[in-house]
Regions:
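Serine-esterase "nucleophile elbow" of acetyl-processing enzymes
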Residues: 1-52, 64-74
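Conserved catalytic region of serine esterases and O-acyltransferases that act on ester linkages
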Residues: 2, 151, 174-177, 181-259
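Oxyanion-hole/transition-state-stabilizing segment in secreted/luminal serine hydrolases
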Residues: 15-17, 56-96, 122-123
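Short glycine-enriched, charge-decorated loop/helix-capping segments at active-site entrances
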Residues: 19-24, 92-95, 130-135, 172-173
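Residue-level recognition of beta-strand->loop/alpha-helix junctions
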Residues: 48-50, 119-120, 158-161
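Conserved, well-ordered alpha-helix/loop/beta-strand core segments that scaffold catalytic motifs
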Residues: 78-81, 108-109, 115-117
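Charged helix-capping and loop-helix junction motifs
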Residues: 94-102, 134-141
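Substrate-gating cap/lid alpha-helix
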Residues: 125-159, 180
Length: 259
């Protein structure tokens, strides 16, 4: 696909957490895709409206209207991914979130844009009651993504089709966001879906590794809880989000790559 403009809507996944930081911004899979698109088109422009922590209603209210202003036709690719943060909340209501998601997809598709959606990885190698609960929620969410994508003719990037993504080594230390290896794999999957140059070995699993010793595993669990889980719970208790006060990293069309 020869793309004239790439517009990204979403949350931390699309912002690029927790990839390498360049000029104060996470790189992420979307920047990597933009790199390849720019090589094929000197007039290519890029917009990334995604902000970490945003819920589906916030993405729809804040980002979709902005995206619509920048759509120029079929050669504009919009990626839309929202709702995973909702599903992580204790008060998650799928009867509210899923219709909101579907309506936003229909609204974007009606502009004539090329549209790409994403499923949520249902299993990331984590275990326990919380992991089981989230897997069930994400499964229902993904079924909705696939259904509305088929309805409007959107492209779907489905991580659950690739078993290697269950390897926790693609996750950052927070056990939630992708690390640089994970973002690179997502970028290659997106590029392949768009029939653009990609690494043909992107599906190759990581080599086997030794099991983490019991004591080190326990220390890692405590460090994770204190560093990530506890602050996350504290923000929820206060009604705060990691995205509060943040702005999109590229809120208007820019030539890419940045010189």
């Amino acid at each position: 696909m020869l793309c004239e403009r790439l517009i990204i809507c979403g949350d931390s996944f699309s912002e690029g957490m927790s990839d390498q930081v360049i000029n104060g911004k996470y790189r992420g899979w979307a920047d990597r895709v933009a790199d390849v698109m720019a090589q094929a088109n000197p007039d290519f422009t890029y917009v990334n409206l995604a902000v970490r922590g945003k819920l589906v209603q916030q993405v729809i209210a804040d980002q979709v209207p902005q995206a619509e202003k920048f759509i120029t036709g079929k050669k504009t690719l919009v990626t839309f991914h929202a709702g995973a943060n909702d599903a992580l909340r204790p008060n998650y209501n799928p009867e509210l979130v899923l219709p909101l998601y579907s309506d936003a997809v229909r609204k974007l598709a009606a502009t004539g844009v090329t549209l790409m959606l994403f499923t949520v990885l249902e299993r990331t190698g984590n275990a326990g009651k919380a992991a089981d609960l989230w897997a069930a929620r994400f499964h229902a969410f993904n079924e909705n993504v696939r259904a509305v994508a088929q309805e409007v003719g959107a492209i779907v990037a489905d991580a659950n089709e690739e078993s290697f993504f269950n390897d926790r080594r693609f996750l950052a230390f927070d056990r939630l966001h992708l690390n640089p290896m994970g973002h690179d794999r997502v970028a290659q999957a997106v590029l392949e879906k768009l029939e653009l140059p990609s690494n043909p070995n992107w599906r190759k699993p990581l080599p086997p590794t030794r099991k983490t010793p019991w004591l080190r595993s326990k220390v890692n669990n405590v460090a994770w809880f204190l560093t990530f889980a506890l602050p996350w719970l504290w923000r929820r208790a206060r009604g705060k989000s990691s995205g509060d006060g943040r702005i999109a990293k590229y809120p208007e069309p820019i030539s890419w790559p940045i010189n």
